[in-house]
Regions:
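Amphipathic alpha-helical interface segments used for oligomerization, scaffolding
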Residues: 1-202
């Protein structure tokens, strides 16, 4: 089992250096999260590779964040492992911090859907900022930002969502004009409204 785990760590994290430490971190995370070591490796490798840091420190950080997410949200290590890959590359490229990413999962799972639904919803939010509609482009510029990515990096994920939702409400325009997908709208309305305090507390 340990040898097999080492092979999986090397495969998942792209090298053998420090593999034993990575496996130990994943095994500890799995034990804490009541998951298999395979689940933990799949989850930590998806996130750490997406963020470009597969060090033992990064693996431990992701494992800790995932454990807290499972405790505070309505999800599991396997569900997170199967879902995070949907949104991590986009989140990382736009400067969304790991803490923000996991706080969304902890807040929205069980509220707007399961882990895969929440990951899809968050991806929709980020896509609406990365490839904005005409209305979203005007909004971003009117707030003094060059791009949606710059907005996220300066205001944070929730701050950005709150600004967009508030602007839509102030203009009387449906949120759909700014965020085209119903999935994105679902998460945005939750994080800017009923779940705003919950997200802030979990962050």
């Amino acid at each position: 089992r340990w040898a097999g785990g080492l092979d999986q760590v090397v495969s998942a994290c792209g090298g053998s250096h420090g593999a034993a430490k990575l496996l130990e971190n994943n095994a500890n995370g799995a034990s804490a999260g009541r998951a298999t070591t395979t689940d933990a490796i799949n989850l930590t490798s998806a996130v750490t590779r997406g963020y470009g840091d597969t060090s033992a420190t990064a693996v431990q950080k992701v494992s800790d964040l995932a454990f807290v997410t499972v405790q505070l949200g309505q999800t599991t290590f396997p569900e997170l492992a199967n879902s995070m890959g949907l949104v991590v590359p986009l989140a990382s490229s736009m400067g969304v911090e790991m803490e923000q990413l996991f706080a969304v999962m902890a807040t929205a799972t069980g509220v707007t859907g399961g882990a895969s639904e929440v990951a899809t919803q968050l991806r929709g939010v980020l896509q609406s900022l990365l490839a904005p509609t005409g209305e979203m482009t005007e909004l971003i510029k009117s707030l003094g930002f060059e791009s949606g990515t710059a907005m996220v990096q300066q205001l944070g994920l929730q701050g950005t969502i709150q600004q967009v939702v508030a602007a839509a409400e102030a203009s009387g325009a449906p949120l759909q004009k700014y965020m085209g997908s119903i999935e994105a709208q679902t998460l945005a309305l939750a994080l800017a409204g009923p779940q705003a305090d919950s997200y802030a507390q979990k962050l």
